[in-house]
């Protein structure tokens, strides 16, 4: 039994299995990272208990978005501390921030000043940036040849989190905002503490194999099944009013089983590793004396003394490619290394100059695809174009999401949980599809990923017009259409930024770009808050 246990632990720690264990754990953490999507579920109760008006509530929605997206500190620390420490900070901010909101809504403490509520809400939702940064940066480095696919899957599960939290709100919290906030205060940090050990950096594979591609397809397939299960349960809950019922709790249990279904990949890899190890032990040949390597009979004087030739010394001193060197310089170095007799034609000062240039490399700015620091990316037009496109796409989408309850009430819909579920599942499909489709076409047709951001924002115009038309049924269809287009922005922006500016400082660059979300929410929130005063 002890031998089997050691084999299992050795298999799990192996370079092939550990990245998949981390990815599966990251999927559940990404669901936790969607905790800011709970705001529509408790915002009305918060408004009633504290007596806020619509402008004050909309400003709290901005705090919700700022906390969700401003993660520069997490991006700065992701290269200095391990992923588990990043996740630990996220669990702590969730516990403190949502804990105070729970105490306020449950009327356990006296209502604090408005700015305190604003700050603690920002702190609680800021846990999302710590969760996102830890798992996204780690897994994109673990799977560098599948960045679009990995980003789409991870961001897709964040999009699904709204439907997951809605199911918890109906089945476990029994549509009680106080119980839902208690879950965010205690349950969310506890789940993070259980999973944070498994998210760790691993040595990436040299290339993407067909087996790895098949595993990604399996995760995508299970996530689609998971999404349609959530859609079905949301419709059943809405039609038959299953809150406070035994069936709704069964739905929640099945939901958690489907959430954990990708664990089949590391289990399969572990079983294969154990089986192969067992077969190797059985079939391993006995060591033979004739297998011992012998030294060559004839050894040169150079090998015995360990001395290096002048050509070898120059080849080590001179870099293979020096920034800014011309073709003549390359030819001279080549002749020196390949033909030592050519050294006689060089004067001693020229040799010293060549060695000096090799020892001190000339600095230059990074080019597209190389590793940029944030300050280097900030002076690039590509960076600001990507930021503005992301700002427009997610800003208008999050404006609708934050005002979904008010939009539903204005169109005669008392319960907006079904709208939140529809938006969440459509958001997931947009994130998953945007990552997979952009990855396929950038490889096969060399079509830039940003084409899909442009196309989705064009469709977004039609979605906003549908919501404004108030035609019968347009609210549901508009939410679905808007959710898909909204999700595409996330899954396309992430790999685009990594391919333009590299992975070394990706945490900082990613978190700066995501600030387009709260800035967009702040820019677009004034029209609706004036309408729904």
What are these regions (language model features)?
Residues 79-92, 440-456:
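Cytoplasmic membrane-interface "Motif A"-like loop-to-helix N-cap segments
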Residues 39-41, 46, 128-153, 165-166, ...:
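Intracellular juxtamembrane helix-capping segments at the cytosolic ends
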Residues 39-46, 229-241, 336, 367-369, ...:
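Extracytoplasmic gate region of multi-pass secondary transporters
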Residues 97, 110-131, 474-488:
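Hydrophobic core of transmembrane alpha-helices in multi-pass small-molecule transporters
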Residues 59-79, 96-99, 103, 163, ...:
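Central cavity-lining transmembrane alpha-helices of secondary-active solute carriers
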Residues 67-68, 145-197, 211-234, 426-427, ...:
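Glycine-rich segments within core transmembrane alpha-helices of 12-TM secondary carriers
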Residues 92-110, 197, 230, 459-470:
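C-terminal ends and interior cores of transmembrane alpha-helices
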Residues 2-7, 199-379, 385-388:
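Long, low-complexity inter-transmembrane loops of multi-pass membrane transporters
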């Amino acid at each position: 039994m002890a031998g089997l246990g050691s084999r299992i632990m050795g298999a799990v720690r192996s370079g092939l299995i550990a990245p998949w264990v981390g990815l599966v754990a990251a999927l559940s953490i990404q669901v936790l990272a969607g905790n800011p999507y709970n705001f529509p579920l408790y915002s009305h109760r918060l408004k009633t208990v504290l007596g806020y008006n619509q402008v004050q509530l909309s400003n709290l929605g901005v705090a919700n978005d700022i906390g969700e997206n401003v993660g520069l500190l997490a991006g700065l620390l992701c290269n200095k501390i391990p992923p588990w420490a990043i996740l630990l900070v996220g669990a702590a901010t969730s516990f403190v921030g949502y804990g105070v909101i729970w105490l306020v809504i449950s009327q356990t403490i006296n209502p604090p000043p408005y700015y305190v509520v604003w700050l603690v809400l920002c702190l609680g939702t800021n846990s999302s940036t710590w969760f996102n940064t830890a798992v996204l940066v780690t897994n994109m480095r673990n799977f560098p040849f599948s960045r679009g696919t990995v980003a789409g899957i991870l961001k897709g599960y964040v999009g699904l989190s709204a439907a997951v939290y809605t199911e918890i709100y109906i089945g476990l919290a029994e549509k009680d905002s106080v119980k839902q906030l208690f879950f965010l205060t205690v349950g969310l940090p506890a789940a993070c503490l259980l999973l944070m050990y498994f998210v760790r950096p691993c040595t990436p594979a040299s290339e993407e194999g067909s087996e790895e591609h098949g595993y990604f397809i399996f995760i995508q397939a299970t996530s689609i099944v998971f999404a349609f299960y959530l859609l079905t349960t949301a419709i059943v809950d809405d039609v038959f009013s299953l809150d406070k019922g035994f069936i709704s709790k069964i739905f929640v249990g099945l939901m958690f089983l489907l959430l954990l279904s990708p664990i089949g990949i590391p289990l399969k890899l572990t079983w294969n590793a154990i089986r192969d190890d067992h077969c190797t032990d059985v079939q391993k040949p006995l060591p033979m004396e004739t297998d011992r390597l012998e030294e060559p009979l004839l050894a040169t004087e150079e090998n015995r003394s360990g001395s290096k030739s002048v050509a070898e010394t120059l080849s080590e001193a001179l870099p293979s490619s020096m920034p800014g060197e011309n073709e003549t310089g390359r030819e001279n170095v080549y002749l020196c290394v390949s033909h030592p007799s050519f050294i006689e034609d060089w004067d001693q000062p020229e040799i010293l100059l060549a060695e000096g240039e090799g020892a001190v490399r000339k600095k230059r700015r990074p080019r597209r695809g190389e590793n940029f620091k944030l300050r280097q990316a900030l002076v690039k037009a590509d960076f600001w174009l990507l930021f503005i496109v992301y700002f427009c796409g997610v800003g208008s989408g999050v404006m609708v999401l934050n005002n979904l309850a008010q939009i539903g009430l204005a169109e005669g819909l008392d319960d907006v949980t079904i709208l939140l579920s529809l938006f969440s599942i459509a958001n997931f499909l947009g994130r998953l599809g945007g990552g997979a489709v952009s990855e396929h076409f950038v490889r096969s047709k060399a079509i830039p990923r940003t084409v899909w951001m442009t196309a989705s924002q064009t469709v977004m115009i039609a979605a906003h017009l549908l919501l404004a038309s108030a035609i019968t049924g347009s609210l549901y269809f508009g939410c679905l259409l808007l959710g898909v287009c909204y999700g595409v922005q996330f899954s396309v922006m992430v790999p685009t930024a990594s391919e333009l500016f590299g992975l070394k400082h990706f945490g900082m660059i990613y978190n700066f770009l995501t600030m387009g979300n709260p800035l967009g929410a702040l820019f677009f929130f004034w029209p609706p808050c004036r309408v729904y005063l």
